[in-house]
Design a protein with these regions (language model features):
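Hydrophobic/tyrosine-rich beta-strand signature of extracellular beta-sandwich/beta-rich modules
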Residues: 81-85
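Proline/serine/threonine-rich low-complexity linkers at boundaries of modular beta-sandwich domains
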Residues: 1-2
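Short beta-strand segments within Ig-like beta-sandwich modules, predominantly Fibronectin type-III
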Residues: 53-64
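Acidic, Ser/Thr
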Residues: 21-28
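Short, solvent-exposed loop/linker segments at the N-terminal edge
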Residues: 6-17
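Surface-exposed, short loops/turns at beta-strand junctions within beta-sandwich domains
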Residues: 63, 68-80, 90, 194-199, ...
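Preference for solvent-exposed, low-hydrophobicity sequence contexts
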Residues: 100-101, 120-204
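Short, solvent-exposed loop/turn segments at the edges of extracellular beta-sandwich modules
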Residues: 86-103
Length: 204
């Protein structure tokens, strides 16, 4: 297995310390009569890490390995890290009579497993002081519940979303008190402007 202490959606430009944990299974010989041991493969020899920060080959013949990256800056999109494991030749299987049975598993490489951290820009909403909504994939539908009173103290309810979402068409819906359905509102009543947040183009 290959796991990471950081995963899922993270804000672009945020700094993370990431620890990767690898557990290697040598498999088993079943049934195991009189072989030297019941493991199908030999011990691991090297753990091969790859990712946006480059590659590293770590010599290690134990079944677990750990790698830590400190101060990693989350990039936009997929930040994919992987690890493959090289292992030595396995034990010679034996038959119930103690004879060699087939051949030992040759030395080889366990195919790489990967974890992905997705860097995204946040979406903000609110009146006056805006707050971030939970991070989500760029281009997916942004759904926020507006308050009944959309103007407070001269400030209007506002949504700010990065331009990577600009291919989406904003829609405002209001619940119809009679039908209880959600009706689309006239978008000409709403203003969409270009703004900049920390150097990132946004729509508001």
């Amino acid at each position: 297995s290959f796991t990471s202490t950081v995963n899922g959606f993270k804000e672009v430009g945020s700094i993370a310390d990431i620890t990767f944990n690898v557990n290697f299974s040598r498999g088993s010989i079943t049934p195991q009569y009189s072989a030297e041991n019941n493991y199908r493969s030999g011990s691991p020899t090297t753990y091969n890490y790859n990712g946006p920060v480059g590659s590293e080959v770590k010599a290690n013949n134990t079944l677990t390995d750990t790698k830590t990256i400190t101060g990693y800056s989350i990039a936009i999109g997929n930040n994919t890290f992987s690890c493959s494991v090289d292992y030595s030749i396995g034990t010679q299987p034996k038959s119930s009579k103690g004879n060699d049975y087939n051949s030992p598993l040759p030395a080889g490489t366990l195919a790489a497993k990967s974890v992905t951290i997705t860097g995204v820009y946040p979406v903000y909403n609110g009146i006056g002081t805006l707050s971030k909504i939970p991070l989500q994939a760029h281009g997916t539908a942004i759904a926020v519940d507006a308050p009944a009173d959309m103007v407070v103290g001269g400030n209007r309810f506002t949504i700010q979303y990065p331009n990577v979402w600009s291919g989406k068409t904003p829609i405002v819906q209001q619940e119809n008190e009679l039908s209880k359905a959600w009706d689309n509102q006239n978008m000409s009543e709403y203003e969409i402007t270009d703004i900049n947040i920390s150097g990132v183009p946004y729509k508001q």
